[in-house]
C-alpha cells in the first residue's frame, strides 16, 4: 500500500469517510485520495513524495501558486503579533478598502470565515432588508452547505424546493425556489407566480460546481432587470470567481451590477476566509447598525487578513489577468486539440483563470446542468487516473472546474498537454 492509502484507512477510523469535505474522498473517480504533504509553485507533493502539477489550487485560492514568498512572509510577520484577538484591527480596514477599490458594486463589506458563512449571511440580510422569505437559486449552482441552499429543483424548474440532504426540514426548503441556469424564461415564470415573496436571486456568475459553465450573453443582465422589476435583490456569489475571472470579478468581466456580492477563496490567500458586501443602504441593515444579526469569533482574523492583503496587492500587477487568461486558454484549447486529433469527443469551456472539459458528443456550447449530467463519466474517471499516473492533479470530480495559477509556466503547460495527447492516443 502507498502511504496515502495507509493514511486514508487510518483516517476513516476517526474522520467520517476519512475526509473533512466529501469530494476529497475520490468517490467521483474511485480509488484512494492523495494525502498531500506540501506544495510549492504549480506543484503539490503527496505523502509518498510524488510530485504533481496541480490544477486544483486548493479549489481556487492559490491563484499565484502555492507557498508564494510574499504571502508566506506576510503570514509569518502577522504571527509574530498574535494569532487572534476577537477585536477590530487595522488589517480589517485595509482589506475592506482593498475589496471596495477593486469591486465597484461593493460600498461596504463584512468579513467572515468561510464562503458558506458569506452566502448564508447575505441571504439572511436580503430577507431582512426586503421583508420577504423566499429565495431563488439555480439547479447545479452550489453556494455552501447552509440549509436553505442545499436544495434541488425536483421534477421541473418551477417545482418548489425539496431538501437534497437529510437533516433539512421541508419547512426550510419550501422557501428555496429553483430555476434553470442560463434560462431567463424559467426565472421570470417563477417570479410571476411569486411576485411579492422573493427576497433575492443568488447565483454563481460562472457555474463552477457543475464543472465550468459561463453565462450566456444577456443572462446576468436579464436577472438584474427581473430583480429590479419585482423588488428583489441580486446576489452574485463570487466565492469562486471573485478576483479569479478578472480584477473586479465575474461581475466586472460580464458587466453586471449586483446588490450584494459574496467572496472567499482568493481574498484569503489560502487562509480560511469569506466576505459579503454591496450597497451601503443594504449593508447598513446588518448589526450593529441594523436589525439583521450576524457575528463570528474569528471574523477578520489577522493572519487571514495579512495573507489576503498580500495576495490582493500582488494581483494588481499590470497584465497579470491577461497572462492568467492566456495560460488558461492554452490549456483548455490544448485539451480540445488533442481530443480532436485522436477522435475523442470533448467539449471545453474557459474564462479568466477557470476551465472545464466535458467528455460528450454534444459539440454545442455548454450552457446547462442537463448537458453536464449527460457527459461520459467513465471516460472522465479513466482520464483522471491516467493523468494522476502522469503526475497531473485535477479535481476528482467531473462537476468541478479546473484552476490555473500564475505559477504554471511554459514547462508545466507543455508537459500537461503532452500527457493529454498520450492519454487520448491510448483511449482511441
Swiss-Prot record:
Its cofactor is pyridoxal 5'-phosphate. Keywords: Cytoplasm, Isomerase, Porphyrin biosynthesis, Pyridoxal phosphate. Pathway: Porphyrin-containing compound metabolism; protoporphyrin-IX biosynthesis; 5-aminolevulinate from L-glutamyl-tRNA(Glu): step 2/2. The modification N6-(pyridoxal phosphate)lysine is found at residue 265. Its EC number is 5.4.3.8. Pfam families: Aminotran_3 (PF00202). It comes from the Bacteria. It catalyses: (S)-4-amino-5-oxopentanoate = 5-aminolevulinate. HAMAP family: HemL_aminotrans_3. This is Glutamate-1-semialdehyde 2,1-aminomutase. It comes from Shewanella frigidimarina (strain NCIMB 400). The gene is hemL.
